[in-house]
Design a protein with these regions (language model features):
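Bacterial N-terminal signal peptides that target proteins for export
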Residues: 1-9, 19
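Formylglycine-dependent sulfatase
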Residues: 10-13, 22-442, 446-476, 482-483, ...
């Protein structure tokens, strides 16, 4: 499947927006695309992002060979809406997903939404996904879009929001650490039963097998969505041994704790969390090494990122005990709109076609990948819908990116103890958080106050007025989205309980 690419790209601006197109020689095949998504990986969880203990050599190497972003934002601070935004390029609320999706609920990606896979399939790509989907309420919901409907020809899907072993009799018997052989995966809608390995290796092995069995010369899109480092943590002994000094004596004596017992047990130490990151990194390495062995490294765009911020040591629920995500000093965590909940690692590599070893401080969003890839891979975006991102090709060409719209984020968390932070908007160095009543509650200059400690509400009236007006305009556009109206969706809060 060896392909070539025209290194000299000619970019033409097409209209007042940021849409650009790349002119290719007629006989040049398109590049491959691999998107690798980690689950709940924090901004400070990788050595490439400053972690002093965790070893992530494969992701570090990816950063050295590509572009690493310091101000990259996941589309949302929760799994389901973030994944919806990443794959569609649309603010998650537009897609019908405002929060994480519990099993059995009537929530799923809107049927009139189009993913990157849908669009690349139209261009003749082979498409496959391996890992966590979480864009519907389960594999049994035939009334809801499944991975096949989202454009994936081949599918190894974890049908829930996390992995578990349902062969055990009750939740109390299901191990949280050490040995979780998942039962929730399906291959092309057929249940696999209980796996004989942990989730990460199950996913990476499937990727390698799919590539080995791919016989045609078509370009491919692989969406690899690891369940690591979402709880339950499950890592082979060799990775636990790497961080033995950071695992408590009690944890070493009791490698399996059970769901009903955690709250009355001693702290297990951070080592199990560190081990799970290194285990995930090794699986990333397997995928990247395979692409290199195939001779496709120079012709493959690789994107690595996380769906949202981490669960930190400040556990809110019993199932969060003993997690140890790091934000590198950013305020907040998964499920809120502080920087720690939405600013995450992100790296893009594309051989010699984009800079190598570059670090960009330009604020970008997971919603930017769709228009960026449309330009890089020479496919058109539908004109019947609003896209919230814009191409970041200027950044990859070492030019300044002129943002046409601010970055906007939303959260609708029905189980949140204090659900006050529903919206956030970033424009340049300024970020505003708006509460559920629509009141501007916080304003920060992130260039001067990265940790969000100095609230400027009432102190910067002109900035406050300008950004709040931008928010109202943007929110109105989202609430009146044409695809939402076509589905009959209403911009109302999530109320399940």
């Amino acid at each position: 499947m060896k392909k070539t690419f025209v290194a000299g790209m000619i970019c033409l601006a097409l209209c007042a927006g940021s849409t650009l197109t790349t002119v290719y020689a007629a006989d040049v095949k398109q590049p491959n695309l691999v998107i690798i998504l980690a689950d709940d990986l924090g901004y400070g969880d990788l050595s490439a992002y400053g972690h002093q203990i965790v070893k992530t050599p494969n992701i570090d190497k990816l950063a050295q060979e590509g572009v690493r972003f310091t101000d990259y934002y996941a589309p949302a601070p929760l799994c389901s809406p973030s994944r919806a935004g990443l794959l569609t390029g649309r603010m998650p609320f537009r897609t019908g997903i405002r929060s994480w999706i519990p099993d059995g609920k009537d929530v799923a990606l809107g049927r009139n939404e189009l993913t990157i896979a849908n669009l690349l399939k139209q261009q003749g790509y082979d498409t496959a996904m391996m890992g966590k989907l979480h864009l519907n309420a389960g594999a049994g919901r035939t009334d809801q879009p499944q991975a096949k409907d989202m454009g994936f020809d081949y599918r190894l899907v974890n049908t829930a929001g996390f992995v578990t072993d349902s062969t055990l009799d009750s939740a109390k018997q299901r191990p949280r650490y050490g040995m979780v052989y998942p039962t929730g995966f399906t291959r092309n809608e057929k249940p696999l039963g209980r796996a004989n390995t942990f989730s990460g290796e199950l996913v990476s092995s499937e990727v390698l097998n799919w590539l080995d069995n791919k016989k045609d010369e078509k370009p491919f899109f692989l969406y690899v969505a690891f369940t690591e480092v979402h709880s339950p943590l499950a890592s082979p002994k060799q990775y636990l041994d790497m961080y033995s000094p950071y695992i408590s004596a009690y944890a070493k004596q009791h490698p399996d704790l059970f769901y009903g017992d955690w709250a009355d047990k001693p702290w297990r130490g951070v080592g199990e969390y560190y081990a799970n990151i290194s285990y995930m990194d090794a699986q990333v390495g397997k995928v990247l090494d395979k692409i290199k062995t195939m001779g496709e490294e120079e012709n493959t765009i690789v994107i690595f990122t996380s769906d949202n911020g981490p669960v930190t040591r400040e556990a809110r629920k019993v199932y969060e005990l003993n997690l140890a995500g790091e934000t590198d000093g950013l305020r907040g965590r998964k499920d809120n709109l502080w920087e720690g909940g939405i600013r995450v690692p992100a790296i893009i590599k594309y051989g010699n076609h984009i800079p190598q070893g570059m670090v960009s401080e330009t604020p970008i969003s997971g919603l930017d990948w769709m228009p960026t890839l449309a330009q890089m891979m020479n496919f058109s975006l539908p004109t019947d819908r609003t896209y919230d991102g814009q191409s970041i090709m200027p950044v990859l060409e070492k030019k300044e990116l002129n943002r046409l719209k601010p970055l906007i984020f939303g959260i609708d968390m029905p189980f949140q103890d204090d659900p006050t932070d529903e919206w956030a908007i970033r424009d340049g160095d300024w970020k505003m958080i708006i509460d559920r009543e629509g009141k501007a509650k916080y304003l920060y200059n992130l260039k001067q106050d990265r940790a969000e400690t100095l609230n400027q509400i009432g102190k910067q009236p002109e900035v406050e007025k300008r950004i709040y007006a931008e928010f109202l305009k943007y929110k109105n556009d989202i609430d009146n989205d044409s695809l939402m109206k076509a589905r009959g969706d209403k911009p109302t809060p999530v109320t399940w309980g």
